[in-house]
Amino acid sequence: MAETQVRNFNINFGPQHPAAHGVLRLVLELDGEVVERVDPHIGLLHRGTEKLMEAKTYLQAVPYLDRLDYVAPMNQEHAYALAVERLLDIEVPKRGQLIRVLYSEIGRILNHLLNVTTQAMDVGALTPPLWGFEEREKLMVFYERACGARMHAAYFRPGGVHQDLPDQLIEDIGKWIDPFFTTLKNLDDLITPNRIFKQRNVDIGVVKLEDAWAWGFSGVMVRGSGAAWDLRKSQPYECYSEMEFDIPVGKNGDCYDRYLIRMEEMRQSARIMRQCVDLLLGKERVGPVSNTDHKIVPPKRGEMKCSMEALIHHFKLYTEGYHVPAGEVYAAVEAPKGEFGVYLVSDGSNKPYRCKLRAPGFAHLQAMDFLCRGHMLADVSAILGSLDIVFGEVDR
């Protein structure tokens, strides 16, 4: 009897698939139900952000950063602001640093809540997202009360932050922290010991530490494999060196470890937030929130009403913008998804010559083939969920 030629089966996963997290298209080659090859097709959300930033002044480029990882927008602005501040060689006052750290940690919790609960939803649990989004809604209100926008904040500006926070808002953030631990415990009790969740995540998508470094992973992807690498500790920026917090580290490098790390990181973020709130209501209650050099940071409205110089500064800042000394700088922050870096090249004019964005999700997505090979088709969505990918930053 003649042998029949067995051909592998090709299917498209996405870009309309609910588990594809945005506009991802995966071309999967299957042998029965075993994944032989994964080919991610990206670029469906490409907007040419890096090129557009070259035609804008340094201040006008800030809103582009919000639209990258739009789940935790302020963390991206943070890296850009740090890069511009290094080129300008200016310092942010202590109160401004604390506000930045506070809102960066709010962004981290926003991101991890979305990821952990949708990861549970990807494998069939429908309750966690409802609980998670309830907390995210409260945090979105804190975003809104700080800068007027729920998502695209443009709140971190080079030199500091846009406006000071009212005491009432800081108190409300402080009141939110303790009940949040209860919510986390409820989520923990619901998902962590769940038999089905464990079966879908334990020993799935295992990454050894040397592989993680070789693929250019950062953030949770590296910590899940056993390295305590966190830019907030290893290369501290702002006032992170004064904060007390721990870095959770995994042992097995699988999807389940990465989930556990994200859960613990939310607790650590809440700890950092508590320290920031105490300082902002205590020792650092009064003080400037941005650099006082009016050649870079616009003067206050009150000054503009009675000072001609202030009005001229304001006009120059919002028409021409400030000129940044020629040079190049790389600034990175520990964004919720990993190391988000901004490589900024200045030619001495009022617009960036080149701004390269290093998105953590980009490096993680390229390893999809390496991670999924040999797994079942159903595991693809579990692995994708644990990578924590948002397409704004992958395609930019």
From Swiss-Prot:
Belongs to the complex I 49 kDa subunit family. This is NADH-quinone oxidoreductase subunit D. HAMAP family: NDH1_NuoD. NCBIfam families: NuoD, PRK06075.1. InterPro entries: NADH_Q_OxRdtase_suD (IPR001135), NADH_UbQ_OxRdtase_49kDa_CS (IPR014029), NDH1_su_D/H (IPR022885), NiFe-Hase_large (IPR029014). It is an enzyme of class 7 (translocase). Its main location: membrane. It comes from Brucella suis biovar 1 (strain 1330). It catalyses: a quinone + NADH + 5 H(+)(in) = a quinol + NAD(+) + 4 H(+)(out). It is found in: Cell inner membrane. The gene is nuoD. One of its GO terms (molecular function) is quinone binding. PANTHER family: NADH DEHYDROGENASE [UBIQUINONE] IRON-SULFUR PROTEIN 2, MITOCHONDRIAL (PTHR11993:SF10), NADH-UBIQUINONE OXIDOREDUCTASE 49 KDA SUBUNIT (PTHR11993). SUPFAM superfamilies: HydB/Nqo4-like. NDH-1 is composed of 14 different subunits. Subunits NuoB, C, D, E, F, and G constitute the peripheral sector of the complex. It is a peripheral membrane protein. Keywords: Cell inner membrane, Cell membrane, Membrane, NAD, Quinone, Translocase, Transport, Ubiquinone. Pfam families: Complex1_49kDa. Gene3D superfamilies: Cytochrome-c3 Hydrogenase, chain B.
